[in-house]
Amino acid sequence: MAAAVQVRLHQASFSERALDAYRTHCAMCRLKHRELLDAAHIIPDSDPDGHPEVSNGLSLCKIHHAAFDRAIIGIRPDYVIEVREDVLREEDGPMLKYGLQALHNSELFLPSRTADRPSKDALERRYQSFLR
């Protein structure tokens, strides 16, 4: 119970700092509507290594946050976005084509401050789970 309370207490601060670091843009599609953005953890906060630090976070719009959490989209440690192979082969409407498939091999939008950029170690760990 104490861990759950601690997680909730840091969420607002983590979210604010992450969104500010990315200048209120989605790191994948550059959407700038704050009300449609989330602070996503690279290493989940339920993991002992999932610290509430900006370097363990990304500012993502709601669709890209969901796609990242469900391993539809992965991010390599060199900040390149990959879309899962089966999703790349799908045919559907414009949201799939332009909202997901078009991101494949594009570069992540990064914070200006080097210290706020995603941890390459955290990205590597998360990317390995994306590949499975």
Q: What kind of feature is each model-predicted range?
A:
Residues 1-2, 34-37:
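Short amphipathic alpha-helical segments, especially helix-boundary/capping motifs
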Residues 1-25, 43-55:
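Short, charged surface segments at domain edges that flank catalytic/cofactor-binding sites
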Residues 13, 31-34, 42-132:
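A detector for short metal-coordination/catalytic motifs
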Residues 25, 38, 60:
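The −1 position to Zn-ligating cysteines in a subset of zinc-ribbon hairpins
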